[in-house]
Amino acid sequence: MSFDVPDDLRYLESHEWVRVAGDTAEVGITAFAQDELGDVVFVELPDEGTELTAGEDFGVVESIKAVSDVYAPVSGTVTAVNDRLRDEPELLNEDPFGDGWMLTVEVDDKSETDDLLSPDAYRDQIE
């Protein structure tokens, strides 16, 4: 099965994605991750203002099959949280790269994204 891997994103081996624009990064889980999880029934995210550390967990995604931690691709301060996921966790399944975004972060050090997987490297990992 082939999964969508947008070329404008960077990826973690743990199946999170990050879209960096200036000093802001939007974060979510990949199409592969949501498929592996199955139907998502609950999402726990941090509050705005929370400090994230790259590689550390920041939330939980619960599906009918599993409970999984979600990891920060970059360090920084949470500036927005997708509150729709509290009432509509299925957005992670329906649109993981769009309406299913999880949070935005004011990035402390953009060079951290240099260590993340390129789209091609992530494709190689999930094939």
From Swiss-Prot:
Q: Which family does it belong to?
A: Belongs to the GcvH family.
Which positions form S-S bridges?
A: none
One of its GO biological process terms is: glycine decarboxylation via glycine cleavage system
What is the name attached to this protein's record?
Answer: Probable glycine cleavage system H protein
Subunit structure, interactors included: The glycine cleavage system is composed of four proteins: P, T, L and H.
Q: Which sequence positions carry the modification called N6-lipoyllysine? A: K65
Sorted alphabetically, which keywords does the UniProt record give? Answer: Lipoyl
Q: InterPro entries attached here? A: 2-oxoA_DH_lipoyl-BS, Biotin_lipoyl, GCV_H, GCV_H/Fam206, GCV_H_sub, Single_hybrid_motif
- Top-level taxon: Archaea
Q: Entry cofactor note text?
A: Binds 1 lipoyl cofactor covalently.
Chain's role: The glycine cleavage system catalyzes the degradation of glycine. The H protein shuttles the methylamine group of glycine from the P protein to the T protein.
